[in-house]
Amino acid sequence: MTGSNIRGIDQKFSPVITTTREELDRRGIASTGDYVAQLPQNFNNISADTGSGSVAGAVGVNLRGLGTESTLVLLNGRRLASAGAEGAFTDISGIPVSALERVDVLTDGASAIYGSDAIAGVVNFILRKDYNGAETRMRVAHMADSDSYQVGQTFGISTERGRALLSYEYSSDDGLDANDRSFTKDFPDPYTILPKTKQHSAFFSGALNLTDGLEVFSDAFWSSRKSEQTNNLYLTSLNVSEPESRGGTLGGRVDLPGGWQAELSGSVAQSDWNLWAYTIPSTHEWGAGSVRTNASNVWSLDAKADGALFDLRGGTVRAVLGAQYREEDYDGWSDFLDVNYDLLDQRYSDADKARNVSALFAEVYAPLVGASNAMTGVKELAVSLAARYEDYSDFGTSLNPKVGVMWSPLDSVTLRATYGRSFRAPLLSNLVDRINYVALLDYLDPESPGGRAVAVMPVGNRSDLDAEKSRSWSVGIDWQPAFAPRLDARMSYFDIDYTGRVGVPFPELNFATFEWYDHPLPVQRTFDMAEVQRFLALSGLPLNNFTWNSPDGVEYELSDATLLVDARMTNTQTSRVSGLDLDVGYGLPLADGHLQLSVNAAYFIDAEDQFSSLRPVVRKVGRMFTPARFRAMGGASWSRGAMSTSLFTRHTGSYTDQQAVPSSKISSWTLFDLSFQYHFERGAAPALLAGTKLSLTVQNVFDKDPPRISMIVAPTAGERFAPYDAQNADPQGRVIALQIMKEWGGR
């Protein structure tokens, strides 16, 4: 059960959204990226839709909009290696839907259970286990000016002695160019808004019962992707991204006296990533482009034992004790290409960092009131206590507790509450004393003569960063009324106070005047030019001079600088988010079949950032490029015999376009998805069709364009930025998909 390390308990304390493989099929979900993009609690700032060169085709999970690095992603309950240019997030795009049994989304802080990163929540992808037979999948999808294809094969065997499952999937996507959509036709050609991708994925899961009470288990995965996109905003650049990930787990479980069970396992996860940015040598001062590469590795040894402690009148008190030793390392570097597209061997932005982590954890579940001692007003009462202590070799220790209370005053009503502390260790890439570049800016400064000054600004990392910390609490109510036993309604309130966040306090650019202004940055009015030269040497790059477009028409030199603006990463930012989640399901018989209704909605009451205690609070919800205040997904699925159909809607509420002068309202966006399935069951269909399931899915049935936002045009070079919010909208339009799934033998 995601959210607890104790076997055999019904984890009702923290809210968990569970989506089964059957539901994924009904909704026509073709990839894990599609799943998280439609999740109302997720904010899509890292996805294929962004068209970001550094992560083309990658998909990260960003619960509550607190950043992909603040959501822990697990595969079968274990960590994956980080990906991206700085190892800043876990790329889930390589996990095929065909290999999944279910997806659990825990929308609560969980560092007491899982350790670092579980601040906004946890997403746990659970692989299929008990399956007999073979399954072949083929899917083709079409949208205007683009096609995608998927083929997959799964083999499984399950007996009393053990089980094994092997799954492979290949996918190909043509991508999408800006000139293929009316709302981006003004972009300079060529320009890619969705990358072209090809991907291979393979997964294995197995277990063997050596004797009664002794089992060995293993799982393994491999994924490789190639993505291509063209960026022509500043200069023509073909970006080719080639990530590869692999890993596995080997362990054993043994039954102990008294109903206890012990587990020992070792796991490893690796992620390699290369980005080749090819330019036209004659138009780029540094030649033919650049390459960025990094490798992230995680290996761990885990031991735990859980079982019953003693009995109370309300039930059995259960506990788990465990320990973990983990090693992580990160290595990354960049280099330029010459006119022949060969490496110049002029490495810059080097990063090579490693650390080890030792952890101890414990958890106790105590049912105080149960069926045997229920009373009026207290039908059930239980508490959960958990704590995890971690010792990091690079920044120190962290102790994170969590407490949960669950109370049922009526058989149909359950009230729950949690409180806990969580943390996030700094990224290894952040702890390298590295300067990415040094910029020279025309800076708005009210304390300088004329209200402006020439500033030199180092941008990069620092090695003295500390861990980020958070306190979170939630309360909720679950309702299953006796008069409607098929109704299951859950509502939760969440509140996360997130301090010491690592970030770059970068200045903002005023697009009206192309001037930079404080947002907020530590400014040194007296500085040593030798320190600036040290920053330049660390970067390995020439000075990045932005004063070529200064309002007075003068391009300044480094010697003209009168300010040093320190834009290196700091631990000064704080964030706070609060809101409501609603999850409702209701099933009923209809027309000799079954109708299932569902709604999942998320509403932000507030979300705010503060870059330091001396700076004003910035609202970060209901504005462009930030989480929408309200998102919801709901629909109806009806099935009868071999046939099923469903209609789902996805809604994003209206929000503010703060770029417009004056600010304006961006309209809400509502899409409809329709699917139809027919299953040729064995014994009721010709042999060739027996075990075949046909699925037709239409996403965005009415081909609705994303809401328009104000188009930003740089006055000097005509560069254009997307006229839609890629974090809150999707440029694909209507997508029609046909899938054929065939089962061979088994069950």
Model-derived features with residue positions:
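N-terminal periplasmic accessory domains that precede
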Residues: 32-35, 39, 59-62, 91-93, ...
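Outer-membrane beta-barrel transmembrane domain signature of Gram-negative proteins
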Residues: 283-380, 609-635, 648
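Short acidic/polar hinge/loop motifs at secondary-structure boundaries
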Residues: 78-107
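Short loop/turn motifs that connect adjacent beta-strands in outer-membrane beta-barrel proteins
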Residues: 130-133, 160-161, 210-214, 257-261, ...
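Short, acidic, small-residue-rich periplasmic hinge/interaction motif at the N-terminus
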Residues: 1-25, 33
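Extracytoplasmic beta-strand/coil segments of soluble accessory domains associated
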Residues: 8, 36-79
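C-terminal beta-signal and adjacent terminal beta-strands/loops
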Residues: 497-499, 605-608, 650-656, 679-747
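Transmembrane beta-barrel wall of Gram-negative outer-membrane proteins
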Residues: 132-135, 143-261, 266-268, 381-384
